[in-house]
Amino acid sequence: MKLKLIFSLFLVLVFCSLFVFGDENETEGQESRIDCRLVRCMAANCTEGQVPYKKKGECCESCMLDCSLVDCYTPKCKKGYYLKKPEGQCCQICQRECSAIQCGIPKCAPGYISQVPVGECCPTCVKKPVNPCALVLCPIVDCMIGWVPYKPEGECCTKCKQDCTTVKCAMPVCEDGATPTKNPNECCYKCPPVNCAAVQCLVPKCNANESLYTPPERCCPICRPNPTLDCTNTLCPIVDCMIGWVPYKPEGECCDRCKQDCTLVKCAMPVCEDGSKPIKNPNECCYKCPAVDCSTVRCMRPLCNENEHLYTPPGKCCPICRPNPNCTDAICPACVGHIEPGQCCPTCDTIPVGPDCTTVKCAMPVCEDGAKPTKNPNECCYKCPPVNCAAVQCPVPKCNANESLYTPPERCCPICRPNPDCTGIMCPECVGTKLPGQCCPTCDSIPVEMA
């Protein structure tokens, strides 16, 4: 009776152990198996010399070296080693015979795992690989209709891309017989970029209401209708051009600007290199030589003295020697940089941190003499460059009885502006001059009360 009871208990223990460990192994097996029918694979974008290849246990193809292009050398293995071709490689290597070796299981410290190195039989402790995405907090991606989530290679967070199953693409016909290509995260093929430097274009003649336009990824221009300009809600500043300059409205803009009055300018016709014809821009008065294509010019490098440096003049391709500047009285900015040949001050690599311009709203100023507004590196807003007012002849406007002359800052010529309302303003008791447009005098001296 006792023997039957002991035997029954033994059977129960064996059954329980088989049930527990069998269920655990089955769970692990279920977790390790992936149903490739539920996986959507991108086409392997292999380069020249590579072929698509599917690794064991994976659903999608990756790229590996085309073994038909590889000439392998068969090594001679020493005793205890045998020839084996690793998965994903083309050539055989010598691998140790591990069937006759008994290995112990190492006890690894925290942060280390047991792993068998390549070419070895027994496991050793190696540092556990760090997952760079473990500490990255990714946003929840809610893709719109027609887009699907995907994780780009080498990135931690999921992004949205177009669902190519809902997109119908037309195969483009590329110029010069080029083959269309497709990026991994795009649905449609497109033409590769063309080297436009080697393309000779025929310039079409456009109508009066058309203009030349070069489409993206194309080399040659086409004619397209001019866009209609709507200036209904545009508020333009009053343009007051100085003597020798006239107002004009640039094509495609709503507001007037100032340009030089070409009837007062005498120009000399330049003689250009290589027999090229001088050209004139629409808003300029004088002709100038077109830019030279220096890509086909070979230059002889001149040997300069110690007090000279190489310099390439504007519009020229080849450098010449010119004297170094006198840097005795030069005032240079405080920055870290390198000094170019022929310069006194360094080209700043690092500039001190300026103001936070994200909180500043600036209006673009309209400068006199047609000058372009400039912006200093440590400032947020554009401003007009300083004008030499000594060389400017200003017409003095006639102001009304309730107006006075006023010269705005950074301007040379005065304008009329309304006089201020001085009722109720208490002025200090002093000796001074009352300027036009002011309520109180500018005090030269203040009387002192005697005790």
From Swiss-Prot:
GO cellular component labels: extracellular region
Signal peptide bounds: 1-22
Intrachain disulfide bonds: none
Key word Cytoplasm present: no
Keywords: Glycoprotein, Secreted, Signal
Compartment(s) where it occurs, according to its Swiss-Prot or TrEMBL record: Secreted
Main location as per UniProt: secreted
Record: glycosylation sites: N25, N45, N209, N326, N402
Keyword Membrane: no
Protein name in the entry: Uncharacterized protein DDB_G0274171
UniProt source species: Dictyostelium discoideum
